[in-house]
């Protein structure tokens, strides 16, 4: 397994654009490759963040073509949040002998299906944004994961609030009751990055001696309308007691 901490858009695009293939994952030597075919399956195409990745990937594929003269045939498919549909898309890519596939898993625990199929035909797989379990990623040398460092981003979030509190406690303790009331709005309860960010953002604030009081929390599943609905509900319930979200 190889894991990258680079920006997910940039790293995914570079990996998907053939860097892996031209460094030993493909049977053909770099000089022999005139084009590469990459199949991409997203967990849900209507997700704003995933759409940004899609746009970045398409842009970087074009840049790669211009820089190397190697044609990048990129096919991006949307399983609309259905794991069975995603499995069928993976089957299609492999049956058509794509050079590599990039998979944003609908269900990260179902990665073994993708891995088994890819290993059977020797096609490298780049997982992104949703990391399969460690046991799956260790099964084959041509499995890769590209994603953010969730703990690092969570610690940075917490440190911003710690710095603000240390400079002026009243900037967070708005009602001056000696505690900082917060609500935790999560992306998706089963997403590993969401779980890590939740844990370490709070831990960093506690380590920085912010007197925290959790009022409530909930998951909006990366959906803006769900997040807005939760916040409206919490504001009605807790009002000015909410000092940090």
Question: What are the residue ranges of the model-derived segments?
Answer:
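A residue-level marker of the well-folded mature domains of exported/periplasmic proteins
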Residues: 2-6, 25-245
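Sec-dependent signal peptide recognition
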Residues: 6-14
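Hydrophobic core
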Residues: 16, 20-21
